[in-house]
């Protein structure tokens, strides 16, 4: 009898997923382009387990039970297409190919249609949780050929992380590229979460003058409350970690952040949908700005520090604790906004593409295994379960009340950061979005007047029904013709 599933790609994530699958009672056949990697894996971590090695893709396919299921964990992009091109002639109708890499959702849509035309099922699945999650239980977000889900769901649900209530952090997301799109949104939210935490740390250090030990204890305390999450937990651990000389290691880590591109994909998707993803976009741009280390140092030599004396030196213990409490409010509010914007983008795309998505279930998939896992997600899941047509997360009764209560502290932190020249792009962008979203009137009326003035783009009037458009001859020398192809 053949192996339950085949696996191509034995980097650390691939190896760990294979071991996870085998540990949960399934047999696996594996292949890697560099075949010595297969031999090393079989002689080492896979020794004595129900894992069989192959030295060619043809051999791998021959080792599998029908219908054959092959999961790819290779670098996103052309490498995925190259492997699919090699596999396709060896497969039969009804077989299944699964892409578990960080592929762009539009590539997943293209691949699914191409393989379905040949009678082959295709699933693109988001895998979150890093190396440890792959081994112990990741969050899985599969989408693609719906008929294929029963073929792989027993394996996926077995290896996935389990939430506190025992529910697998895995479920069918939706058709064509929905799985990878949801993973992209997850990654964008991850960028946002990380940035607001970094801004909180920076405020503690520079506005409040807190020691690393004090910051460590504060984040540890926060992790027992409403900010409880994996990222808060590891931040507390990072702040306590010392270098070999006994000083905080964080002091020696260069402030130039890297990124792999999935955050940018989320921002581009938001621009394409016209969805205001301000917090996540600023979080991506903050990394880009940080990477300009040499230019920033040059600018610092030119402009110096705008604030000569830190307020931290004059704070009483009570004032410092009040600001720490306000900072907790700020991080909490911004976190709500990050998810609100992420799910709004998801909603816009789902409507355009005809995806039927269960936002409550999607939020629950992230409760365990993944990088953004937190207790907070149960509240989001409940909000969407109670109101399936919820227009925006901030309008859910629970989150609306939380924002009303915590908003004053949020404003305090953003205002104090501006006064002390501390950049908080994510916290401030989130607040600006919140004020705009909750504002019944905005200055966009002037924008429309300007557009009509120079381009005859027309405008709607407050004293006329929506959908009725007007044009004004602003200078007396124009005309009554409205804009055609020219627009801005």
Curated annotation (Swiss-Prot):
Q: How does this polypeptide assemble, per the annotation?
A: Homodimer.
Q: Which UniProt keywords apply?
A: Gluconate utilization, NADP, Oxidoreductase, Pentose shunt
**One Pfam family here:** 6PGD
Residues the record lists as binding NADP(+): 9-14, 32-34, 74-76, 102
The pathway that the record names for this protein is:
Carbohydrate degradation; pentose phosphate pathway; D-ribulose 5-phosphate from D-glucose 6-phosphate (oxidative stage): step 3/3
Query: What GO terms describe the biological role, i.e. biological process, of this protein?
Result: D-gluconate metabolic process; organic acid catabolic process; pentose-phosphate shunt
Q: Which PROSITE patterns match?
A: 6PGD (PS00461)
Q: Which reaction does it catalyse?
A: 6-phospho-D-gluconate + NADP(+) = D-ribulose 5-phosphate + CO2 + NADPH
The task this protein performs is described as:
Catalyzes the oxidative decarboxylation of 6-phosphogluconate to ribulose 5-phosphate and CO(2), with concomitant reduction of NADP to NADPH.
What is a single molecular function from GO for this protein? Answer: phosphogluconate dehydrogenase (decarboxylating) activity
Q: Which Enzyme Commission number(s) are on file for it?
A: 1.1.1.44
Q: From which domain of life does this come?
A: Bacteria
UniProt similarity note:
Belongs to the 6-phosphogluconate dehydrogenase family.
Q: What is this protein called?
A: 6-phosphogluconate dehydrogenase, decarboxylating
Q: Which gene encodes it?
A: gnd
Which cysteine pairs are covalently linked by disulfides here?
none
Q: Which SMART domains match?
A: 6PGD
InterPro entries attached here? 6-PGluconate_DH-like_C_sf, 6PGD_dom2, 6PGDH_C, 6PGDH_Gnd/GntZ, 6PGDH_NADP-bd, 6PGdom_BS, NAD(P)-bd_dom_sf, Pgluconate_DH
Q: Which residues form the active site?
A: 183, 190
């Amino acid at each position: 009898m053949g192996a339950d599933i085949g696996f191509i790609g034995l980097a650390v994530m691939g190896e760990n997923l294979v071991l996870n699958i085998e540990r949960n009672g399934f047999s696996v056949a594996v292949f890697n382009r560099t075949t010595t990697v297969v031999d090393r894996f079989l002689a080492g971590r896979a020794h004595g387990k129900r894992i069989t090695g192959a030295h060619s893709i043809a051999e791998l396919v021959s080792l599998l039970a029908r219908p054959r299921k092959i999961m790819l964990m290779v670098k996103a992009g052309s490498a995925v297409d190259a492997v699919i091109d090699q596999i396709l002639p060896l497969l039969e109708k009804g077989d299944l190919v699964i892409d578990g890499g960080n592929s762009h959702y539009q590539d997943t849509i293209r691949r699914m249609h191409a393989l379905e035309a040949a009678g082959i099922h295709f699933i693109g699945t988001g895998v979150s949780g890093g190396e440890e999650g792959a081994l112990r239980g990741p969050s899985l977000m599969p989408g693609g050929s719906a008929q294929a889900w029963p073929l792989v769901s027993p394996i996926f649900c077995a290896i996935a992380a389990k939430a506190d209530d025992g529910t697998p952090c895995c479920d069918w997301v939706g058709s064509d590229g929905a799985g990878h799109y949801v993973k992209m949104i997850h990654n964008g939210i991850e960028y946002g979460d990380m940035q607001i935490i970094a801004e909180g740390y920076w405020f503690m250090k520079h506005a409040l003058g807190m020691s690393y030990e004090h910051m460590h204890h504060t984040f540890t305390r926060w992790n027992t409350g409403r900010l409880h999450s994996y990222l808060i937990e590891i931040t507390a651990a990072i702040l306590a970690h010392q270098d070999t000389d006994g000083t905080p290691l964080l002091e020696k880590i260069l402030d130039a952040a890297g990124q792999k591109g999935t955050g940018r994909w989320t921002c581009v998707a938001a621009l394409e949908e016209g969805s205001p993803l301000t917090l996540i976009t600023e979080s991506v741009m903050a990394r880009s700005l940080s990477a300009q280390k040499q230019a920033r140092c040059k600018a610092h030599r030119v402009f110096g520090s705008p604030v000569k004396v830190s307020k931290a030196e004059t704070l009483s213990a009570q004032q410092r604790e009040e600001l720490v409490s306000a900072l907790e409010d700020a991080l909490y509010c911004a976190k709500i906004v990050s998810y609100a914007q992420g799910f709004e983008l998801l909603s816009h795309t789902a409507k355009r593409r005809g995806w039927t998505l269960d936002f409550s279930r999607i939020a629950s998939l992230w409760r365990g295994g993944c990088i953004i896992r937190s207790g907070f997600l149960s509240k989001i899941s409940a909000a969407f379960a109670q109101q399936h047509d919820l227009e925006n997360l901030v309008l859910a009764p629970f989150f609306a009340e939380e924002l009303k209560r915590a908003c004053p502290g949020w404003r305090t932190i953003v205002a104090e950061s501006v006064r002390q020249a501390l950049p908080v792009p994510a916290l401030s962008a989130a607040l600006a979005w919140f004020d705009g979203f909750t504002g019944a009137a905005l200055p966009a009326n002037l924008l429309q007047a300007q557009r009509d003035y120079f381009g005859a783009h027309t405008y709607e009037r407050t004293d006329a029904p929506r959908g009725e458009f007007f044009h004004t001859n602003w200078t007396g020398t124009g005309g009554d013709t409205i804009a055609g192809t020219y627009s801005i």
